[in-house]
Amino acid sequence: MTRRRHGWQRPLHPLQIVGAVIYSVLVAAFYVFLGFFLGNRIAVIALLSVFSSVAVSVIVLFVRCTAIDPTDKTSAKKKRKDKSKGVLMKLRVKVVLSQVVVRFFRRLERKILRNFLRRTYLDPWKSSVQLEPLLPFPLVMKDDDSVTPDPKEEDDISYCSLCDLEVKRSSKHCRTCNRCVEGFDHHCRWLNNCVGKKNYTTFILLMVFVLLMLIIEGGTALAVFVRCFVDKKGMEMELKRRLYVEFPQWALATISIILVLFTAYGSAAMGQLFLFHVVLIRKGMRTYDYILAMKEENQFTEVDPFDELDSSSDESSDFDSPERLRPTFISKFMCRKANENQQRLSIKIEGDEQSPSSTLINKKPGFHVSINPWKLITLSSEKALQAAEKAKERLRKTKPVSGTEENSLKPLPLETKFGLLLDPDNNNTVLQPSTTAAVKLQVSPGRFSSPRRRFSGSSSSTVPSPKQKYRTNFDLKLTEVSRELESYISRQVLCSVIKQDGSEASPR
């Protein structure tokens, strides 16, 4: 699956197209049936001006929020920084040398003047003018990372095994977009894009202007509906003058009341979603934290109440695949489910396997996470964040050891230096959960892939014999020191198995 960069990248989501169609219908209905039938010229001009500006803002913010790429680019920035550091150092060396030479001659000139001319104003301790320091300015710059590295930046870096890249700790992996999003909040289907740190402000502004647009159109439709019964003659004359056809008033009244109901429903849904995000901002939380907190609360409802999360047990549970947000009846208008039968979110942090406990939780009847701002208001932010952290910690403990994680290990330092890794296209490997088979590689005997994953054998046998199998007791969750020890032991076993001529020997 390719990584998505923005929401306009194909394939487009159906809800994205539906949203554009609804917007076009609302704008066309306002200019054709509502805006010009208020009966007051000043009110018509003012209303058309306000609605036009709001409608243009909505489409601009929608395009911008969908086109923004919220991907975490920490790894790419580091690579660009490393490449540009050499060029900057060359330029800086030239500047430093030129300043050293200039200051040397200036100091020599001052010394000669002090010794022969005896000018007191040239003495640095008697002069009010502060002389330049001995060290050149580029060598003492505070913003240079090579001189004063920022320890907080290094502490904030994590590693995503799915992307195989270094990302920030606040970044999460979205399965729908197949990328890590910086400051991940949620994946919006109406935008066909993830909402994160880079486009969250645009998303909030988009909700505000959409809410204003719905309120203006709903109020105008209600005014036109009332006027159809209060001023029938004036409305009939204005219909002929504006539409140039005989348009019945009952049809206009029907269209108006439909627009009133539709905009009222949309305004309620949008208002609920906007209030939900306002409360999230006030509490310093994200939608993803809210989901994890609700799942944590549901999991320990029968064991410990939510008020006693400090004493909750560390029972193994999988939070890799949180369920999709199941909105309430009102909030279905925004970010609702595309398929009611699915109960998994479109986000995946790491791994595809689920533990038995998580399967039981997901199949638990009535278990869902809804967008409920009223429940969020009564929720303590400290306890919610604590529950979210516990869920994340449980996720790290229960992520699968085999499969994705094993294939996504970063190369060891020695492998990086000496080029021990082999092209994965030429690798014929048979992996088993408890045993690893010795299979001949279709390459020269002198080059091998990572010893942690595969061995080279003879070309005569494609099916390994029982003697060729050996136990693998390597724990992939060890520390970096244990990983180095694992690599050393693997290389020792490899040297004992492989002879110099490339033939196969039984492991000792």
From Swiss-Prot:
Signal peptide: none annotated. It comes from the Eukaryota. InterPro entries: Palmitoyltrfase_DHHC, PFA4/ZDH16/20/ERF2-like. It is found in: Endoplasmic reticulum membrane; Cytoplasmic vesicle membrane. It catalyses: L-cysteinyl-[protein] + hexadecanoyl-CoA = S-hexadecanoyl-L-cysteinyl-[protein] + CoA. One of its GO terms (cellular component) is cytoplasmic vesicle membrane. The active site is at C188 (s-palmitoyl cysteine intermediate). The chain crosses the membrane at residues 17-37, 42-62, 203-223, 250-270. Belongs to the DHHC palmitoyltransferase family. PANTHER family: PROTEIN S-ACYLTRANSFERASE 18, ZINC FINGER DHHC DOMAIN CONTAINING PROTEIN. This is Protein S-acyltransferase 18. It comes from Arabidopsis thaliana (Mouse-ear cress). The lineage of its organism: Eukaryota, Viridiplantae, Streptophyta, Embryophyta, Tracheophyta. The gene is PAT18.
